[in-house]
Amino acid sequence: IQEVLWRIYWKGWLELRPGVWADYLINLKTHREKYKTDKNYLNAIEGNTNIQCFDDWVKELKETNYLHNHARMWFASIWIFTLDLPWELGAEFFLKHLYDGDSASNTLGWRWVAGIQTPGKHYLASEWNIKKFTNNRYEKIKLNESAKPKASTKVYSVSKNNFSNSEINDVKTLLIFDNNLSFEFSDFKDKKFNKILIVNSIESREILLSDNVMKFKKSLLQDQLKRLKNLSIDCEIVKIEDIKKYGDDVCALYPSVGENLDFINSNELKNIQFLYRKIDQLSWQYCNKGFFNFKNYIPKIIQNIS
């Protein structure tokens, strides 16, 4: 339960500070241009750093599209402090290759390792820790174990958002995005929507996905389509560009801060009425501070859900 709520917390934290995501994308574009021919960066993404554990994780990530949480932390720390590469590029590399890549937990996790999510507190990978938890698989791991946290003077104020749901009628068309593909288990499963549109934004992203991740996400879209049709629900998959042509009778399972919401906002699609999950409504109000403060409210959140 705590692991699930970790992700919900990260999403809520970013919802209250959407400027963090916006600034991440701005800085990412700058670093892409600066490092596009940088040998150190190119060696890192190809797994040619001569740091065996890191190179193995690059290969594992590209082939399996997954890394254990320990490996993710070690990877990010080595990227930032030993290879001295911008955390923004590392976060992009993860989003490109992870099946479970998420704009909030990924961005904020990399910020935490760097020492800017919790200012002055960073995560430094160490040789002994890697050896211990990999059963001494690796030897002579030369890392920068004395690096200082990355500095950031930017302070983000907490925004006051309204996550309440307005009354919806049954004639509306519903949009579902790729991070909400369980409609039949959602809070809105009993609503009789006119039609459900499953939005494909896989090829229309600022951060391009690997072929494996695109295939995986497309299979999830098809699976949701199949399950909805089995329930005799009128539905189809549409490209994200096509949602601009729908009128006012449109609502959407809220996609959260990230690329799908960016598309909606950049195209000024103000006609879309967002629907928020109950667990998010209950949780995000407590995301104004750190996780350990949020953790105190978990029993209350669970009680209110049930």
Where are these regions (language model features)?
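Trp/Phe/Arg-rich N-terminal binding region typifying the photolyase-homology
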Residues: 1-2, 6, 11-12, 16-29, ...
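Active-site-proximal binding-pocket segments
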Residues: 1-170
